[in-house]
Amino acid sequence: MNTAKVDKVIEPRDIRHKLGLNQQQFWSKIGVTQSGGSRYESGRNMPRPVRELLRLAHVEQIDIQRIKRDDVDIVEFLKSENPEAYKALKKEARAWRKSR
């Protein structure tokens, strides 16, 4: 699947087209019905939590079903208690992701 790059304003229809997904595929990934997604694409105001889920799932390509509280806690702990280890792991993770 392609990665959609966007500016600060997230236009869901543009992202969906860049990813080559239909409305059902695109919106169901973040728990929105096809008809609800269609309304957002037509200009209805999108709540901030929906916009953030859209960004995480489709722009950042994060599988939000796999995010666990423990994982978030580990990252927060490393960032605050051992920032050098966090930076080193972040660098290694980026290299690993590029090699896949």
Question: Where would I find each of the regions flagged by the language model?
Answer:
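Short, charged recognition helix plus adjacent turn
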Residues: 61-100
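A short, Lys/Arg-rich alpha-helix, primarily the initiator
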Residues: 1-18
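DNA major-groove recognition helix of helix-turn-helix/homeodomain DNA-binding modules
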Residues: 46-67
